[in-house]
UniProtKB/Swiss-Prot annotation:
Keywords: Methylation, Ribonucleoprotein, Ribosomal protein, RNA-binding, rRNA-binding. GO terms for cellular component: cytosolic large ribosomal subunit. InterPro entries: Ribosomal_uL11, Ribosomal_uL11_bac-typ, Ribosomal_uL11_C, Ribosomal_uL11_C_sf, Ribosomal_uL11_CS, Ribosomal_uL11_N, Ribosomal_uL11_N_sf. The gene is rplK. The lineage of its organism: Bacteria, Bacillati, Bacillota, Clostridia, Natranaerobiales. It comes from Natranaerobius thermophilus (strain ATCC BAA-1301 / DSM 18059 / JW/NM-WN-LF). SUPFAM superfamilies: Ribosomal L11/L12e N-terminal domain (SSF54747), Ribosomal protein L11, C-terminal domain (SSF46906). Part of the ribosomal stalk of the 50S ribosomal subunit. Interacts with L10 and the large rRNA to form the base of the stalk. L10 forms an elongated spine to which L12 dimers bind in a sequential fashion forming a multimeric L10(L12)X complex. Gene3D superfamilies: Ribosomal protein L11, C-terminal domain, Ribosomal protein L11/L12, N-terminal domain. PROSITE patterns: RIBOSOMAL_L11. This is Large ribosomal subunit protein uL11. One of its GO terms (biological process) is translation. One or more lysine residues are methylated.
Length: 141
């Protein structure tokens, strides 16, 4: 018989840097999950993606066991890395902070394709371009 799901927790944690400190500790602690075992497993699984913010979906079962699925980094994080900026524009319609080429947008769209609600690469690229526009990043090409 399948285990009963008690809760699904969604967090964004830096790759390889999960610690029992907030936000991880309190989110898992209130559901009785072994925080250290989650941190250890997450850090092992994301060690190769150092410096990225990784969304994770943790499924907690009634017997306090858990499973988790890591997703691809948010498009905004990937765009900031591609553009070489630390912070997006506070006023994207007035202040443009960087430019990225269509080739970079395509790379990001291909990487994000599995987590996106898009039927083809063109649709995924349009989503990434929209994210770039809302961040004050100009897409060239």
């Amino acid at each position: 018989m399948a285990k009963k799901v008690a809760q699904v927790i969604k967090l964004q944690i830096p790759a390889g840097k999960a610690t029992p400190a907030p936000p991880v500790g309190p989110a898992l602690g209130q559901h009785g999950v072994n925080i250290m075992s989650f941190c250890k497993e997450f850090n092992e699984q994301t060690a190769n993606q150092e410096g990225m913010l990784i969304p994770v979906e943790i499924t907690v079962y009634e017997d306090r066991s858990f499973t988790f699925i890591t997703k691809t980094p948010p498009a905004a994080v990937l765009l900031k890395k591609a553009a070489g900026i630390d912070k997006a524009s506070g006023e994207p319609n007035k202040n443009k902070v960087a430019t990225v080429g269509k080739d970079k947008v395509k790379e990001i769209a291909e990487l994000k394709m599995q987590d996106m609600n898009a039927s083809d690469l063109d649709a995924a690229m349009k989503m990434v371009e929209g994210t770039a526009r809302s961040m004050g990043i100009i897409v060239e090409g």
